UniProtKB/Swiss-Prot annotation:
<dbReference type="GO" id="GO:0016020">
    <property type="term" value="C:membrane"/>
</dbReference>
<dbReference type="GO" id="GO:0005851">
    <property type="term" value="C:eukaryotic translation initiation factor 2B complex"/>
</dbReference>
<dbReference type="GO" id="GO:0005737">
    <property type="term" value="C:cytoplasm"/>
</dbReference>
<dbReference type="GO" id="GO:0050852">
    <property type="term" value="P:T cell receptor signaling pathway"/>
</dbReference>
<keyword id="KW-0648">Protein biosynthesis</keyword>
<feature type="modified residue" description="N6-acetyllysine">
    <location>
        <position position="35"/>
    </location>
</feature>
<dbReference type="GO" id="GO:0005085">
    <property type="term" value="F:guanyl-nucleotide exchange factor activity"/>
</dbReference>
<keyword id="KW-0963">Cytoplasm</keyword>
<comment type="similarity">
    <text>Belongs to the eIF-2B alpha/beta/delta subunits family.</text>
</comment>
<dbReference type="GO" id="GO:0014003">
    <property type="term" value="P:oligodendrocyte development"/>
</dbReference>
<protein>
    <recommendedName>
        <fullName>Translation initiation factor eIF2B subunit alpha</fullName>
    </recommendedName>
</protein>
<keyword id="KW-0396">Initiation factor</keyword>
<dbReference type="GO" id="GO:0005886">
    <property type="term" value="C:plasma membrane"/>
</dbReference>
<dbReference type="GO" id="GO:0002183">
    <property type="term" value="P:cytoplasmic translational initiation"/>
</dbReference>
<dbReference type="GO" id="GO:0042802">
    <property type="term" value="F:identical protein binding"/>
</dbReference>
<dbReference type="InterPro" id="IPR037171">
    <property type="entry name" value="NagB/RpiA_transferase-like"/>
</dbReference>
<keyword id="KW-1026">Leukodystrophy</keyword>
Amino acid sequence: MDDKELIEYFKSQMKEDPDMASAVAAIRTLLEFLKRDKGETIQGLRANLTSAIETLCGVDSSVAVSSGGELFLRFISLASLEYSDYSKCKKIMIERGELFLRRISLSRNKIADLCHTFIKDGATILTHAYSRVVLRVLEAAVAAKKRFSVYVTESQPDLSGKKMAKALCHLNVPVTVVLDAAVGYIMEKADLVIVGAEGVVENGGIINKIGTNQMAVCAKAQNKPFYVVAESFKFVRLFPLNQQDVPDKFKYKADTLKVAQTGQDLKEEHPWVDYTAPSLITLLFTDLGVLTPSAVSDELIKLYL
């Protein structure tokens, strides 16, 4: 499976199921790559998978694709320590890969079950941009016969908040799209904030769509709970202390980074994500359970060791 086939398979997965997270599509692609790989050594197979992850990150530069790929590789690689025979080892690696994929496929439902209980009847919720996990949580709240209304930011520059509003309208949830600049104004009307995350970092902070940080700052100033919902495959080994510590490969789209290689200054480009410090986050709802920001590092160590 060469780079071109790898990229085409990844894009076809995204096209087949628009509701699928890019990280899940990447893991499905890596599993298919593993099945088709014609390498003859464990070391060679690992090297090929590492190269495939780098190729996928070149197509989709999101934090989740990077962390999901690395966690997938670590999860299946445990088999190489248990078996010396290559064919048997590869078979076990494929089985472990399929198990990993099944586990992450259940993540959103687990998170929804945990989080929707925090939504009280008659609540007003503020959310940011389009998040499949947040949408699943709100679907669970609707299924539990809870009445609530939602404010969603339009989320420039791609207006993904309007996509979220459309999805909520299909659920018959009262929803209002507000300007990104109106977050401080609208916060006093909200009872709680729920956002997704592209990545959860080692100190319990998050990397998410640009504008998340200012929403968290406003929520903290007005004593409103700020909840984050994220799957465990988004836990990434990164320890930013401020916005400048977030690597450019995560801040900008893959196409922008390719143009930047020709000499264009990235200072002229708008970042797509920002960093939100753990001190601004109330709780994180994950498929591993409900975590305080300070507990994230322990869970992250368990995942990566």
